[in-house]
Amino acid sequence: MVALNVGNGFLFPISWKGVGSLNESASTSESANAAFTVSIVIPIVSIKISTNPGFSTGHSISRPTYALQDVDGDGYLDIVESEKESELKVTRSAIGRTNMLKAVTNSLGGTFTLDYAHTVPTYGLPGGKWVMPSLTVDDGIHDDGPLMTTAFEYKDGKRDRHEREFLGFGEVITRNLDTEKENALYRKSVQKYDVSGYYTQGNLVNASVEDAAGKVYTETRNEYDGYYLTAKGDEYTFTAQPVLCSDRASAFVPLRYTANLQYEGAAQGMITSEAWNEYYLTGHHGELKSYRFSNKGKLGSKGDGKFDYQTSIRYTSNSSRNILGLPTDVTVTGGDGKVYHQVSAVYDTKYPNHLTRITQQLGNGEAVTDYRYDSFGNILQKTLPANAKGQRMWYKYRYEPEMNMYVERVEDAFGYRSEAGNFDYRYGIAKERRDLNNFYYETDVDDLGRVTGVRGPNELATGVPYIIAFEYSPKAEFTANGITAPAYAVTKHYDIQHPDDDMETVTFVDGFGRPVQVKKDGVVTSASEGTVFDAQNVMIVSGRNVYDAFGRVAKAYYPVTEELGKRTDFNKAFDGVSPTVTVYDVLDRATEVTLPDESKTLTAYTTDAGSRALVTTVTDALGNKQATYTNGSGKTVMTKQLSGPDGEITTTFEYDGIDRLVRVTDTEGNVTTSVYDMGDRRTEVNHPASGITTFTYDALGNVLTKQTANLAKEGKSITYDYDYHRLTGINYPDHPENNVKYYYGGRNASQNRIGRLMLREDGTGAIEYFYGKMGEVTKTRRTLIVPNQAIATYVTQWTYDSHNRLLEMIYPDEEKVTYSYNLGGQLEKVRGYKSYGYDYVNRIGYDKFEQRTYLKYCNGAETFYTYDPAGCRT
């Protein structure tokens, strides 16, 4: 009985008549036999001697005539037949790629298609391997660029005969094909792996990117160490071993050295960065002991060359609870021997990762941060380092009782409190929050964990259902020819000035979730001198993008407009103005950008061996050139303005071992230097114009003093006062009348001022702040001390909506100015009131770029704005 596999299961067993012929053979046998007897009689002793000589011969031949064998090594049995000795017939299996995944189409309309091939059997991989030689990606939208096709090549496959396991391929080549040019090779990435043994399998030893001509652009080299591991209880010992091959040993193969090289198409590469790792080999568990880094190219694979910095790490553990590898001390030392950072940590080793204290050395002190935990491992309290007055800011956390994992309350040393509640435990989302000033915010979530609506204190007070709402349509409409209606999401912004007409934004995505179009409400004005003002409510549609064969934006078009009523219909229109065209190199960097007015910006990438930097040279449309030199850490080490009336202008930048900027030299040789402490805080700046300015700090990081070059002559400094980490005062040594004081709202403050700046006093007087429900400043009371005159007080008030748009402003003379917005959210009209109403601005008009095109003042004066259609410039 045979049950056939149909891919997703087996059919009902059937009787297969040919099963008896799965293996047939034929045999032929021949034999011959001869014998005779000879007798000799001896009468005297009555003995008779007889002998029976004989011989026999035979041979047989047996050969299969019908069998199932894997002849071609594809992993499937072939039919082998032979009816005579001189003939062999093979019927190859047609299974091949049958039942292998061919294509996947998701609900967004995207499809990726896979192909398969069988590698040629070799000595290293006798049976070969089914592999994926190509992958084609279709985003479902076919008028914005070609399909993306990637081809793969596999080499040096290895099967460990001893372990009977496939160790992988020694080399994998990824080829990006230009589907716009008949699948011509554009670039290839080559990854080489160590497959020499079971313990080293899968280690990446080399990775490079090349162009179609085989010129290398980048390369990464990795080197590994090999160790045998022996354990005595929880004490491990690692013994170096160049070749790892054992049936019983445990092995450790860590990364020792990494070098990154930049070629930019040249024959010789330049090392831009190196990293070297050292590990604990005795008494530990193979943790990282030290790490060295260099962007100078002088470190070497043994780590014995010059380096920028070295990070050394020490650990603690609790073997009885299998808690291992907790770092207790991290020290960063520069190549010059200077200690840049030193941080120590203390743990409660009864629990994993219960970090209880972090101590950072500052050079003239230390900064200590403490943590406390509950029985579930949640942080109960975090206490920050002390300020100059010994105050330590702390935060306490309380968790909801259902799951004991989500924070429901946060309190601090000021007595402030914020809360969260009504959790959707499916997704860990708090649906209700309360801020420091006791205002609530609500969030609606659907059954898929997506936010569908948000309400703030303004909406909760007025009964408005949302300030922002979201609608989702994640399933596209598509056929075999592509997407006909892309998936989209709608964002609604409630507009208090147009309560029946939300400001809406619709975002469309392609088959792989990439945003391809955004529509938004807008008002476009057609107005020019001598014509009638015309404003139309439309949807402004973002410009279409055309992608190249590698998913990069090759052409970017200007936006278009459409009439209302089609918000969820994908707009396929392309603007008539020439697009912005971008050309890229094989590393996906823009090399040429052509704007609609045909002006071009060119970018060239080269290397400079002298400074060991990547040089990026930009030439704009006017021929101006600037070169930027970047080191292996991504820091700018030099800029050169290569054109201009003053000739070449050069600025150089120097960094310490951990990439802090310490020296800037301009083209005339003027030098600015900076000095830092162990907390990365700048303690001194020496500027050629202003001289030396020094700063001091407390352990919390607050600036305590600032001393300029002029104040240093008198031995004086500007000082700063704090309450925990909040600035409360600035004190000037020579003019105390100019001192500044800051006052903040306490836990019972009114006017929504809890935790916010309430009053500032300075030499000119004072200013008091009042706030709205969402933290916006709604009123200020400014008191000025005018010499030889009375004290003057000025009150200014503002009203904002929940989108932080200014709706109304009341000046100190009680004039009220209101601001009106169009359906697209742009300012449209400004009107004033004082005794009577009058317009400041009657009308403001905009184009599809939301640039101003029209402005009419109350006196009838009109201003028209026109733009170059190609360059979009005035």
What are these regions, as identified by a protein language model?
Residues 6, 70-76, 95-96, 106-107:
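Calcium-coordinating acidic loop motifs
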Residues 12-19:
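Beta-propeller fold detector
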Residues 20-34, 55-66, 110-115:
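Repeat-based blade/solenoid architectures
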Residues 86-92:
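Structural motif
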Residues 62-71, 99-102, 119-122:
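Beta-propeller blade termini
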